[in-house]
Curated annotation (Swiss-Prot):
Species annotation: Notamacropus eugenii
Keywords, comma-separated and alphabetical: Calcium, Disulfide bond, Glycoprotein, Lactose biosynthesis, Metal-binding, Milk protein, Secreted, Signal
GO cellular component: a single term: extracellular region
Full protein name: Alpha-lactalbumin
Residue intervals of the C-type lysozyme domain: 20-140
BP terms from Gene Ontology: defense response to Gram-negative bacterium; defense response to Gram-positive bacterium; lactose biosynthetic process
Tissue specificity statement from the Swiss-Prot or TrEMBL entry: Mammary gland specific. Secreted in milk.
Length: 140
């Protein structure tokens, strides 16, 4: 009886928002709809996203003193804000928690800003390690 009650309470406590785990071609299509194919080759970007977040909208990683959020693993180190009062000082002008919802439009807009950096996709270390060569499996 106690374990049934525990499971019931756990079910109530879980957040209502479910993660979306995209498949590579779904992600590629959404990125194309938002013009990302004009910014960066989609196979490289989808490969990178897969290796940093598993293409999951609710991926959240503690990385030393920083925290990274969402499908693009956007860092709270200047790109987004942990607290509402810090939003205006962040590059993307958004709360980091917004990168954990199922609407990735704001994630994409922030990623476009990151891609304007001189290192481009190199901002994400997984790109250089996994997504430079042999990208056939990431094409749709």
């Amino acid at each position: 009886m106690m374990s049934l009650l525990s499971l019931l309470l756990l079910g109530i406590a879980l957040p209502a928002t479910q993660a979306i785990d995209y498949r590579k071609c779904q992600a590629s299509q959404i990125l194309k709809e938002h013009g990302m194919d004009k910014v960066i080759p989609l196979p490289e970007l989808v490969c990178t996203m897969f290796h940093i977040s598993g293409l999951s909208t609710q991926a959240e990683v503690n990385n030393h003193s920083n925290k990274e959020y969402g499908i693009f693993q956007i860092s709270n180190n200047g790109w987004c804000a942990e607290k509402q009062e810090d939003v205006a000082n962040s590059v993307c002008g958004i709360l980091c928690s917004k990168f954990l919802d199922d609407d990735i439009t704001d994630d994409i807009e922030c990623a476009k800003k990151i891609l304007q950096l001189p290192e481009g996709l190199g901002y994400w270390k997984a790109h250089e390690t996994f997504c430079i060569e042999d990208l056939d499996q990431w094409r749709c």
